Amino acid sequence: MSVIELLEIPLIGDTKESQLPSPEEYTYWKDRKNRTFYVDYEIDECYSLVELAKIIIQINIEERDIPKEQLQPIRLFIHSYGGDLEQANFFCDLVQASRIPIITIAMGVAMSAGFLIFLSGHKRYAFKHTQLMVHSGSAAFQGTAEQIEEAQKNYKKQIEEMKAYILEKTTIDEKTFNKNKNKDWYL
């Protein structure tokens, strides 16, 4: 008997026709049952965050008649280098508005937009070696001079709102924030 024959693993039936879920499907449904979700991707317009938002909304709707003290929390693990500020803002608003408590747990990295989402949790935890980072972001504008001017005004407004949000959600004072806001500030 050759070494290759010893390593063969027999399969029962055709896995393509099986009624068993794929490993990804199994993990998804098990995590959903356990109310555990992950933001482990770039926060952009790829709709992963929108899909997660839909799930959180649906759970809130399904459990609207359960007394608040009996609600089981949702755990949201974050490992993200960040991304789009608008996407992060809508998701932060949703998390904060959730009737169901949402616990955010930073693992590895929670930077930029990922850091903002981390701050939105009703309770927050971070693994010991997690890197948290905040900065004023970056943007690119195109269009007419007037369109670019309006876009810049809007971006400055968003940065001021982000500053107010961070100051509200942390013990960082305004002087310290202002001193560090123009760089990648690792906390």
Q: Where would I find each of the regions flagged by the language model?
A:
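Terminal-region recognition feature
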Residues: 1-187
